[in-house]
Amino acid sequence: MIYLDNSSTTKPYDEVLNVYEQTSSRYFGNPSSLHRYGAETEQLLQAAKNQIKRSLGLKKYDIVFTSGATEANNAALKGAALSKIKTGKHIIATSIEHPSVTESLEQLKELFGFDITYLSVNEDGFVSIEDLKAAIRPDTVLVSMMHVNNEVGSVQPIEAAGEVLKEHSNILFHVDYVQGIYKVPLAIEKAGIDLCSISGHKFHGLKGTGALIVKEGTRLIPLITGGSQQKGIRAGTEHTAGAVSLAKAINLASADFDTRLDTMTAVKELFMNRLSEIEGVVINTPQMNSAPHIINFSVPGIKAEVLLHMLEEQDIFVSTTSACSAKEHKPSKVLLEMGKGEQIAGSSIRISLNYSQTSDVAEPFMNALRPGIKKLREMMR
Protein backbone atom coordinates (compact mmCIF):
# COMPACT_ATOMS: atom_id res chain seq x y z
CA MET A 1 0.00 0.00 0.00
CA ILE A 2 1.27 3.45 -0.94
CA TYR A 3 -0.52 6.27 0.86
CA LEU A 4 -0.05 9.60 -0.93
CA ASP A 5 -2.91 11.56 0.63
CA ASN A 6 -1.05 13.05 3.59
CA SER A 7 -2.43 16.55 3.08
CA SER A 8 -5.86 15.12 3.88
CA THR A 9 -4.64 13.34 6.99
CA THR A 10 -1.60 11.50 8.30
CA LYS A 11 -1.14 8.30 10.25
CA PRO A 12 -0.64 9.16 13.94
CA TYR A 13 2.74 8.47 15.48
CA ASP A 14 2.71 5.54 17.92
CA GLU A 15 4.15 7.86 20.57
CA VAL A 16 1.20 10.23 20.08
CA LEU A 17 -1.31 7.42 20.51
CA ASN A 18 0.52 6.20 23.61
CA VAL A 19 0.66 9.59 25.30
CA TYR A 20 -3.03 10.14 24.54
CA GLU A 21 -3.97 6.84 26.17
CA GLN A 22 -1.72 7.42 29.19
CA THR A 23 -3.01 10.95 29.74
CA SER A 24 -6.62 9.86 29.44
CA SER A 25 -6.06 7.17 32.05
CA ARG A 26 -3.87 9.00 34.57
CA TYR A 27 -4.91 12.65 34.22
CA PHE A 28 -8.68 12.38 34.00
CA GLY A 29 -9.45 15.26 36.35
CA ASN A 30 -11.22 18.41 35.23
CA PRO A 31 -8.59 21.16 34.91
CA SER A 32 -11.04 23.62 36.49
CA SER A 33 -11.51 21.55 39.65
CA LEU A 34 -9.83 22.81 42.83
CA HIS A 35 -8.73 19.42 44.15
CA ARG A 36 -5.44 17.65 43.45
CA TYR A 37 -6.64 15.75 40.37
CA GLY A 38 -7.81 19.01 38.83
CA ALA A 39 -4.61 20.85 39.71
CA GLU A 40 -2.41 18.11 38.26
CA THR A 41 -4.41 18.09 35.04
CA GLU A 42 -4.25 21.88 34.81
CA GLN A 43 -0.47 21.76 35.23
CA LEU A 44 -0.20 19.19 32.44
CA LEU A 45 -2.39 21.33 30.18
CA GLN A 46 -0.18 24.35 30.82
CA ALA A 47 2.93 22.27 30.17
CA ALA A 48 1.49 21.25 26.79
CA LYS A 49 0.91 24.91 25.92
CA ASN A 50 4.43 25.86 26.94
CA GLN A 51 5.94 23.04 24.90
CA ILE A 52 4.05 24.14 21.78
CA LYS A 53 5.15 27.72 22.31
CA ARG A 54 8.79 26.69 22.70
CA SER A 55 8.70 24.46 19.63
CA LEU A 56 7.19 27.22 17.47
CA GLY A 57 9.35 30.00 18.94
CA LEU A 58 6.42 31.89 20.46
CA LYS A 59 6.84 34.30 23.36
CA LYS A 60 4.00 36.81 23.21
CA TYR A 61 1.25 34.36 22.27
CA ASP A 62 -1.31 32.13 23.92
CA ILE A 63 -2.47 28.71 22.74
CA VAL A 64 -6.21 28.06 22.52
CA PHE A 65 -6.85 24.35 22.04
CA THR A 66 -9.57 23.53 19.51
CA SER A 67 -11.04 20.49 17.78
CA GLY A 68 -8.95 21.24 14.69
CA ALA A 69 -8.21 23.92 12.14
CA THR A 70 -11.78 24.29 10.89
CA GLU A 71 -12.84 25.38 14.36
CA ALA A 72 -9.71 27.49 14.76
CA ASN A 73 -10.39 29.31 11.48
CA ASN A 74 -14.01 29.92 12.43
CA ALA A 75 -13.04 31.15 15.88
CA ALA A 76 -10.35 33.44 14.51
CA LEU A 77 -12.31 35.03 11.68
CA LYS A 78 -15.70 35.39 13.33
CA GLY A 79 -14.21 36.25 16.71
CA ALA A 80 -11.90 38.90 15.27
CA ALA A 81 -14.44 40.41 12.88
CA LEU A 82 -17.16 40.71 15.51
CA SER A 83 -14.73 42.24 17.98
CA LYS A 84 -13.93 44.93 15.38
CA ILE A 85 -17.44 45.46 14.02
CA LYS A 86 -17.71 48.99 15.46
CA THR A 87 -14.39 49.93 13.86
CA GLY A 88 -15.00 48.65 10.35
CA LYS A 89 -16.62 45.91 8.31
CA HIS A 90 -14.12 45.22 5.55
CA ILE A 91 -12.11 41.98 5.35
CA ILE A 92 -9.45 40.90 2.85
CA ALA A 93 -8.66 37.27 1.96
CA THR A 94 -7.26 35.38 -1.00
CA SER A 95 -9.47 33.70 -3.58
CA ILE A 96 -7.96 30.26 -2.88
CA GLU A 97 -8.58 29.92 0.85
CA HIS A 98 -9.84 26.73 2.50
CA PRO A 99 -13.65 26.44 2.69
CA SER A 100 -13.53 26.90 6.47
CA VAL A 101 -12.23 30.41 5.77
CA THR A 102 -14.36 31.38 2.78
CA GLU A 103 -17.58 30.05 4.27
CA SER A 104 -16.88 31.85 7.55
CA LEU A 105 -16.35 35.07 5.64
CA GLU A 106 -19.49 34.61 3.57
CA GLN A 107 -21.44 34.01 6.78
CA LEU A 108 -20.08 37.27 8.20
CA LYS A 109 -21.15 38.99 4.99
CA GLU A 110 -24.65 37.52 5.04
CA LEU A 111 -25.42 37.89 8.73
CA PHE A 112 -23.54 41.05 9.68
CA GLY A 113 -23.00 42.96 6.44
CA PHE A 114 -19.22 42.65 6.18
CA ASP A 115 -17.67 43.49 2.82
CA ILE A 116 -15.18 40.85 1.65
CA THR A 117 -12.43 41.51 -0.88
CA TYR A 118 -10.90 38.36 -2.36
CA LEU A 119 -7.43 38.88 -3.82
CA SER A 120 -6.93 37.06 -7.11
CA VAL A 121 -3.93 34.81 -7.72
CA ASN A 122 -1.69 34.40 -10.74
CA GLU A 123 -1.26 31.23 -12.82
CA ASP A 124 1.07 29.78 -10.17
CA GLY A 125 -1.32 30.42 -7.30
CA PHE A 126 0.37 33.45 -5.72
CA VAL A 127 -1.21 36.67 -4.53
CA SER A 128 0.37 40.04 -5.22
CA ILE A 129 1.53 42.20 -2.33
CA GLU A 130 0.69 45.24 -4.45
CA ASP A 131 -2.88 43.95 -4.73
CA LEU A 132 -3.00 43.61 -0.95
CA LYS A 133 -1.80 47.18 -0.50
CA ALA A 134 -4.39 48.44 -2.99
CA ALA A 135 -7.20 46.54 -1.27
CA ILE A 136 -6.65 48.07 2.18
CA ARG A 137 -9.29 50.65 3.11
CA PRO A 138 -9.87 52.83 6.17
CA ASP A 139 -12.54 50.35 7.33
CA THR A 140 -10.39 47.22 6.84
CA VAL A 141 -10.20 45.29 10.11
CA LEU A 142 -8.93 41.83 9.15
CA VAL A 143 -6.73 40.09 6.59
CA SER A 144 -6.73 36.30 6.23
CA MET A 145 -4.12 34.54 4.10
CA MET A 146 -3.25 30.85 4.01
CA HIS A 147 0.44 30.06 4.25
CA VAL A 148 0.52 26.98 1.97
CA ASN A 149 -2.31 26.21 -0.41
CA ASN A 150 -3.70 22.79 0.38
CA GLU A 151 -4.27 21.78 -3.26
CA VAL A 152 -1.29 23.02 -5.26
CA GLY A 153 1.23 23.85 -2.53
CA SER A 154 1.92 27.48 -3.46
CA VAL A 155 3.52 29.36 -0.56
CA GLN A 156 2.07 32.80 -0.04
CA PRO A 157 4.30 35.81 0.85
CA ILE A 158 3.23 35.88 4.49
CA GLU A 159 6.28 37.77 5.77
CA ALA A 160 5.86 40.48 3.11
CA ALA A 161 2.15 40.76 3.88
CA GLY A 162 3.00 41.07 7.56
CA GLU A 163 5.36 43.96 6.84
CA VAL A 164 2.58 45.78 4.99
CA LEU A 165 0.11 45.21 7.80
CA LYS A 166 2.52 46.43 10.48
CA GLU A 167 1.81 49.88 9.06
CA HIS A 168 -1.89 49.37 9.83
CA SER A 169 -2.12 48.57 13.53
CA ASN A 170 -5.93 48.45 13.41
CA ILE A 171 -5.91 45.44 11.05
CA LEU A 172 -5.66 41.93 12.49
CA PHE A 173 -3.67 39.36 10.51
CA HIS A 174 -4.85 35.73 10.43
CA VAL A 175 -2.86 32.92 8.81
CA ASP A 176 -4.08 29.40 8.09
CA TYR A 177 -0.86 27.50 8.82
CA VAL A 178 -2.33 24.02 8.44
CA GLN A 179 -0.33 22.82 5.43
CA GLY A 180 2.79 24.81 6.24
CA ILE A 181 3.58 23.75 9.78
CA TYR A 182 6.75 21.65 9.82
CA LYS A 183 6.79 21.69 6.04
CA VAL A 184 7.65 25.32 5.27
CA PRO A 185 9.28 27.37 8.04
CA LEU A 186 7.37 30.44 9.20
CA ALA A 187 8.47 32.86 11.93
CA ILE A 188 5.01 33.62 13.31
CA GLU A 189 6.09 36.37 15.67
CA LYS A 190 8.47 38.06 13.23
CA ALA A 191 5.79 38.05 10.52
CA GLY A 192 3.46 40.04 12.76
CA ILE A 193 0.72 37.40 12.75
CA ASP A 194 -2.08 37.95 15.25
CA LEU A 195 -3.99 34.70 14.76
CA CYS A 196 -2.69 31.39 13.41
CA SER A 197 -4.53 28.08 12.91
CA ILE A 198 -2.99 24.59 13.11
CA SER A 199 -4.34 21.02 13.00
CA GLY A 200 -2.73 18.00 14.65
CA HIS A 201 -3.75 15.31 12.20
CA LYS A 202 -1.84 17.01 9.38
CA PHE A 203 1.50 16.20 11.04
CA HIS A 204 0.92 12.76 12.55
CA GLY A 205 -1.17 13.92 15.49
CA LEU A 206 -4.76 12.96 16.17
CA LYS A 207 -7.97 14.05 14.50
CA GLY A 208 -9.96 16.33 16.77
CA THR A 209 -6.85 18.15 17.98
CA GLY A 210 -5.76 21.60 16.89
CA ALA A 211 -5.08 25.07 18.13
CA LEU A 212 -5.59 28.74 17.50
CA ILE A 213 -2.42 30.67 18.26
CA VAL A 214 -3.43 34.10 19.58
CA LYS A 215 -1.13 37.08 19.99
CA GLU A 216 -1.29 38.65 23.43
CA GLY A 217 -3.76 41.52 23.57
CA THR A 218 -5.84 40.28 20.64
CA ARG A 219 -9.53 40.47 21.50
CA LEU A 220 -11.90 37.83 20.16
CA ILE A 221 -15.63 37.41 20.58
CA PRO A 222 -16.03 33.76 21.65
CA LEU A 223 -18.08 31.42 19.48
CA ILE A 224 -18.49 28.88 22.27
CA THR A 225 -19.71 30.31 25.57
CA GLY A 226 -20.63 28.84 28.92
CA GLY A 227 -17.41 28.93 30.92
CA SER A 228 -14.20 30.85 31.51
CA GLN A 229 -11.86 28.16 30.21
CA GLN A 230 -9.02 29.19 27.91
CA LYS A 231 -9.34 32.83 28.93
CA GLY A 232 -12.96 32.88 27.83
CA ILE A 233 -12.15 32.34 24.14
CA ARG A 234 -13.39 28.74 24.07
CA ALA A 235 -15.68 27.59 26.86
CA GLY A 236 -15.94 23.95 27.86
CA THR A 237 -13.82 21.45 29.74
CA GLU A 238 -10.48 21.22 28.00
CA HIS A 239 -9.54 18.03 26.16
CA THR A 240 -6.35 17.49 28.13
CA ALA A 241 -5.30 14.25 26.45
CA GLY A 242 -5.85 15.84 23.05
CA ALA A 243 -3.78 18.88 24.02
CA VAL A 244 -0.92 16.74 25.32
CA SER A 245 -0.99 14.56 22.20
CA LEU A 246 -0.85 17.70 20.03
CA ALA A 247 2.20 18.92 21.92
CA LYS A 248 3.79 15.48 21.48
CA ALA A 249 3.13 15.50 17.73
CA ILE A 250 4.67 18.96 17.42
CA ASN A 251 7.70 17.85 19.41
CA LEU A 252 8.20 14.80 17.19
CA ALA A 253 7.63 16.78 13.98
CA SER A 254 10.27 19.32 14.98
CA ALA A 255 12.93 16.66 15.60
CA ASP A 256 15.53 16.42 12.83
CA PHE A 257 13.33 18.72 10.77
CA ASP A 258 15.97 19.95 8.31
CA THR A 259 17.08 16.44 7.29
CA ARG A 260 13.53 15.23 6.76
CA LEU A 261 12.71 18.39 4.82
CA ASP A 262 15.61 17.74 2.45
CA THR A 263 14.40 14.17 1.87
CA MET A 264 10.83 15.26 1.25
CA THR A 265 11.98 17.95 -1.18
CA ALA A 266 14.06 15.43 -3.13
CA VAL A 267 11.11 13.02 -3.40
CA LYS A 268 8.85 15.82 -4.58
CA GLU A 269 11.36 16.84 -7.26
CA LEU A 270 11.57 13.23 -8.43
CA PHE A 271 7.79 13.07 -8.81
CA MET A 272 7.73 16.40 -10.66
CA ASN A 273 10.46 15.28 -13.06
CA ARG A 274 8.88 11.91 -13.78
CA LEU A 275 5.42 13.40 -14.29
CA SER A 276 6.81 15.96 -16.73
CA GLU A 277 8.00 13.08 -18.92
CA ILE A 278 4.45 11.81 -19.53
CA GLU A 279 2.85 13.27 -22.64
CA GLY A 280 -0.27 15.28 -21.90
CA VAL A 281 0.29 15.59 -18.15
CA VAL A 282 0.03 19.15 -16.84
CA ILE A 283 1.81 19.95 -13.58
CA ASN A 284 -0.11 22.53 -11.57
CA THR A 285 2.23 22.90 -8.60
CA PRO A 286 4.60 25.83 -9.18
CA GLN A 287 8.28 25.00 -9.64
CA MET A 288 9.37 27.74 -7.23
CA ASN A 289 8.04 28.73 -3.80
CA SER A 290 5.96 25.62 -3.31
CA ALA A 291 5.69 23.27 -0.34
CA PRO A 292 7.90 20.16 -0.31
CA HIS A 293 5.07 17.68 0.20
CA ILE A 294 2.44 18.60 -2.42
CA ILE A 295 2.45 17.72 -6.14
CA ASN A 296 -0.68 18.57 -8.12
CA PHE A 297 -1.07 17.47 -11.73
CA SER A 298 -3.82 17.03 -14.31
CA VAL A 299 -4.46 14.66 -17.19
CA PRO A 300 -6.87 16.66 -19.37
CA GLY A 301 -9.58 14.49 -20.85
CA ILE A 302 -9.59 12.01 -17.97
CA LYS A 303 -11.78 12.77 -14.97
CA ALA A 304 -9.92 12.97 -11.69
CA GLU A 305 -12.20 10.45 -9.97
CA VAL A 306 -11.59 7.86 -12.69
CA LEU A 307 -7.83 8.22 -12.38
CA LEU A 308 -8.03 8.14 -8.58
CA HIS A 309 -9.95 4.85 -8.55
CA MET A 310 -7.67 3.37 -11.18
CA LEU A 311 -4.70 4.04 -8.88
CA GLU A 312 -6.67 2.73 -5.92
CA GLU A 313 -6.97 -0.62 -7.70
CA GLN A 314 -3.17 -0.74 -7.55
CA ASP A 315 -3.29 0.01 -3.80
CA ILE A 316 -2.11 3.59 -4.36
CA PHE A 317 -4.09 6.31 -2.62
CA VAL A 318 -4.17 9.94 -3.78
CA SER A 319 -6.79 12.70 -3.72
CA THR A 320 -8.47 15.14 -6.06
CA THR A 321 -9.42 18.51 -4.54
CA SER A 322 -9.33 19.42 -0.86
CA ALA A 323 -10.60 16.50 1.24
CA CYS A 324 -13.22 18.84 2.70
CA SER A 325 -14.67 19.37 -0.79
CA ALA A 326 -13.79 16.11 -2.57
CA LYS A 327 -17.27 14.57 -2.44
CA GLU A 328 -18.83 17.55 -4.23
CA HIS A 329 -17.40 16.24 -7.56
CA LYS A 330 -16.74 19.77 -8.82
CA PRO A 331 -13.68 21.06 -10.68
CA SER A 332 -11.00 22.46 -8.41
CA LYS A 333 -11.92 26.04 -7.46
CA VAL A 334 -8.26 26.73 -6.76
CA LEU A 335 -7.20 25.74 -10.29
CA LEU A 336 -10.05 27.72 -11.80
CA GLU A 337 -8.89 30.76 -9.83
CA MET A 338 -5.41 30.14 -11.25
CA GLY A 339 -6.92 30.36 -14.74
CA LYS A 340 -6.29 26.72 -15.63
CA GLY A 341 -9.67 26.09 -17.24
CA GLU A 342 -12.38 23.46 -16.73
CA GLN A 343 -10.51 20.53 -18.30
CA ILE A 344 -7.43 20.91 -16.15
CA ALA A 345 -9.43 21.80 -13.04
CA GLY A 346 -11.67 18.76 -13.49
CA SER A 347 -8.84 16.28 -13.93
CA SER A 348 -6.46 17.27 -11.16
CA ILE A 349 -4.81 14.78 -8.83
CA ARG A 350 -2.93 15.69 -5.66
CA ILE A 351 -0.01 13.66 -4.36
CA SER A 352 0.98 14.57 -0.82
CA LEU A 353 3.93 13.10 1.03
CA ASN A 354 4.79 12.43 4.66
CA TYR A 355 8.07 12.63 6.57
CA SER A 356 8.96 8.94 6.31
CA GLN A 357 8.46 8.46 2.58
CA THR A 358 11.49 8.17 0.32
CA SER A 359 12.10 7.94 -3.41
CA ASP A 360 10.98 4.31 -3.22
CA VAL A 361 7.35 5.42 -3.52
CA ALA A 362 7.86 7.14 -6.89
CA GLU A 363 8.63 4.11 -9.06
CA PRO A 364 5.56 1.98 -8.24
CA PHE A 365 3.40 5.08 -8.61
CA MET A 366 4.75 5.82 -12.07
CA ASN A 367 4.50 2.15 -13.03
CA ALA A 368 0.79 2.30 -12.23
CA LEU A 369 0.13 5.76 -13.67
CA ARG A 370 1.72 5.45 -17.11
CA PRO A 371 -0.14 2.33 -18.31
CA GLY A 372 -3.26 3.49 -16.50
CA ILE A 373 -3.39 6.73 -18.46
CA LYS A 374 -2.70 4.86 -21.70
CA LYS A 375 -5.49 2.38 -21.00
CA LEU A 376 -8.01 5.08 -20.10
CA ARG A 377 -7.17 7.07 -23.23
CA GLU A 378 -7.65 4.01 -25.42
CA MET A 379 -11.01 3.31 -23.81
CA MET A 380 -12.13 6.88 -24.55
CA ARG A 381 -11.32 6.78 -28.27
From Swiss-Prot:
Tell me the InterPro entries matching this sequence: Aminotrans_V_dom, Cysteine_dSase, PyrdxlP-dep_Trfase, PyrdxlP-dep_Trfase_major, PyrdxlP-dep_Trfase_small
The EC designation for this entry is 2.8.1.7
Reactions catalysed, as given in the entry: (sulfur carrier)-H + L-cysteine = (sulfur carrier)-SH + L-alanine
Binding of pyridoxal 5'-phosphate, residues? A69, T70, N150, Q179, S199, G200, H201, T237
Give the residues the record marks as binding [2Fe-2S] cluster.
C324
Pfam families for the chain: Aminotran_5 (PF00266)
Q: Does the record carry Transport as a key word?
A: no
- Cofactors (names): pyridoxal 5'-phosphate
Molecular function, one GO term: metal ion binding
- The active site of this protein is located at C324
**UniProtKB keywords:** Iron, Iron-sulfur, Metal-binding, Pyridoxal phosphate, Transferase
Function (record text): Catalyzes the removal of elemental sulfur from cysteine to produce alanine.
Task: Report the family membership.
Answer: Belongs to the class-V pyridoxal-phosphate-dependent aminotransferase family. NifS/IscS subfamily.
**What is the name of this protein?**
Putative cysteine desulfurase IscS 2
